[in-house]
């Protein structure tokens, strides 16, 4: 008398018996079991509309990135509830329009091409589609979600001095003053261990009159005087 919804009630158990015109039972009761046949009336639904993952730059093809998951209220043991995944688009499309692939049954996303470089592309956006009926493009119902993949930094760029020679000066007998500011550039992500420069004086100061430390904000090398310098004895240090 009313429409049936398998997702609400998948099976009905009825008990029936026959009676005569006077209402007396003429047969023993019998059990009737009615199974509601599933119809493909539910689209796949992703657990999240936006999925976030990460992968180190320079990762080899076949590196696992993340897993996306969708569910379907239809019968999971029938075609109506059997899902398949695929990537609809990738942005940006460099260095290849197919940097990633997805396992169509599990939703696992892995790298499929080399060339991930954080200094060139820091983030990829994939549109993922889930389709029931085992991915049938004609009869299956579909839904989409977004996968955002961040390319994380690795230490693949050395610091480079901005000049071959730096100059400084200091009055004699002064200590704890900055005499030179050495500047470097590093293409790795700022304020990470891959970016932080460590300086040392490798020659030209046998008596240890100078020290150098890193400015944590600018990454510059700050040369300071730690022992008094006599102008009449030493007029220049290289």
Curated annotation (Swiss-Prot):
Which BP terms does GO give this entry?
adherens junction organization; calcium-dependent cell-cell adhesion via plasma membrane cell adhesion molecules; cell migration; cell morphogenesis; cell-cell adhesion; cell-cell adhesion mediated by cadherin; cell-cell junction assembly; glial cell differentiation
**Glycosylation sites recorded in the entry for this protein:** 52, 104, 181
Query: How does the record say this protein sits in the membrane?
Result: Single-pass type I membrane protein
| Residue ranges annotated for the Cadherin domain, each copy included | 1-46, 47-161, 162-238
Domain of life (superkingdom): Eukaryota
What does the UniProt entry say about where the protein is found?
Cell membrane; Cell membrane, Sarcolemma; Cell junction; Cell surface
Q: Which residues bind Ca(2+) 3?
A: 40, 42, 72, 80, 132
Q: How is it modified after translation?
A: Cleaved by MMP24. Ectodomain cleavage leads to the generation of a soluble 90 kDa N-terminal soluble fragment and a 45 kDa membrane-bound C-terminal fragment 1 (CTF1), which is further cleaved by gamma-secretase into a 35 kDa. Cleavage in neural stem cells by MMP24 affects CDH2-mediated anchorage of neural stem cells to ependymocytes in the adult subependymal zone, leading to modulate neural stem cell quiescence. May be phosphorylated by OBSCN.
Q: Which Gene3D superfamilies match?
A: Cadherins
Positions of Ca(2+) 2 binding: 7, 38-39, 41, 74
Matching entries from CDD domains are given as: Cadherin_repeat (cd11304)
- InterPro entries in the record: Cadherin, Cadherin-like_dom, Cadherin-like_sf, Cadherin_CS
UniProt binding sites for Ca(2+) 1:
5, 7, 41
Q: Which GO terms describe its molecular function?
A: beta-catenin binding; cadherin binding; calcium ion binding
Q: Which UniProt keywords apply?
A: Calcium, Cell adhesion, Cell junction, Cell membrane, Glycoprotein, Membrane, Metal-binding, Phosphoprotein, Repeat, Transmembrane
Specify one Pfam family.
Cadherin
Q: Which residues lie on this side of the membrane: Extracellular?
A: 1-238
Q: Name one GO cellular component term.
A: cytoplasm
Its job: Calcium-dependent cell adhesion protein; preferentially mediates homotypic cell-cell adhesion by dimerization with a CDH2 chain from another cell. Cadherins may thus contribute to the sorting of heterogeneous cell types. Acts as a regulator of neural stem cells quiescence by mediating anchorage of neural stem cells to ependymocytes in the adult subependymal zone: upon cleavage by MMP24, CDH2-mediated anchorage is affected, leading to modulate neural stem cell quiescence.
Assembly, per entry: Homodimer (via extracellular region). Can also form heterodimers with other cadherins (via extracellular region). Dimerization occurs in trans, i.e. with a cadherin chain from another cell. Interacts with CDCP1. Interacts with PCDH8; this complex may also include TAOK2. The interaction with PCDH8 may lead to internalization through TAOK2/p38 MAPK pathway. Identified in a complex containing FGFR4, NCAM1, CDH2, PLCG1, FRS2, SRC, SHC1, GAP43 and CTTN. May interact with OBSCN (via protein kinase domain 2).
The free-text domain remark for this protein reads: Three calcium ions are usually bound at the interface of each cadherin domain and rigidify the connections, imparting a strong curvature to the full-length ectodomain. Calcium-binding sites are occupied sequentially in the order of site 3, then site 2 and site 1.
Its name, as the record gives it, is Cadherin-2
Q: Which organism is it from?
A: Cricetulus griseus
- Which taxonomic lineage does the organism of this UniProt entry have? Eukaryota, Metazoa, Chordata, Craniata, Vertebrata
């Amino acid at each position: 008398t009313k429409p049936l919804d398998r997702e609400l009630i998948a099976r009905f158990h009825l008990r029936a018996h026959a009676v005569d015109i006077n209402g007396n039972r003429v047969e023993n009761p019998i059990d009737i079991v009615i199974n509601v046949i599933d119809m493909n009336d539910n689209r796949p639904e992703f657990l999240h509309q936006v999925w976030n993952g990460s992968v180190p730059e320079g990762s080899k093809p076949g590196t696992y990135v993340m897993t996306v998951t969708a569910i379907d209220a239809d019968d999971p043991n029938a075609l109506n509830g059997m899902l398949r995944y695929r990537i609809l688009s990738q942005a940006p499309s460099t260095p290849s329009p197919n940097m990633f692939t997805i396992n169509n049954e599990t939703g696992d996303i892995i790298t499929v091409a080399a060339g991930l470089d954080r200094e060139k592309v820091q983030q990829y956006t994939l549109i993922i589609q889930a389709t029931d009926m085992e991915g049938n493009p004609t009869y299956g119902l579909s839904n989409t979600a977004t996968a955002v993949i961040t390319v994380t930094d690795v230490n693949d760029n050395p610091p480079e001095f901005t000049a071959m020679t730096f100059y400084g000066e200091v009055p004699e007998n002064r200590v704890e003053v900055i005499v030179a500011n050495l500047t470097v550039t590093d293409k790795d992500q700022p304020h990470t261990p891959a970016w932080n420069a460590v300086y040392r004086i490798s020659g030209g100061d046998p008596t240890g009159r100078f020290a150098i430390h890193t400015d944590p904000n600018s990454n510059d090398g700050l040369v300071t005087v730690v022992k008094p310098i006599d102008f009449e004895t030493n007029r220049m240090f290289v």
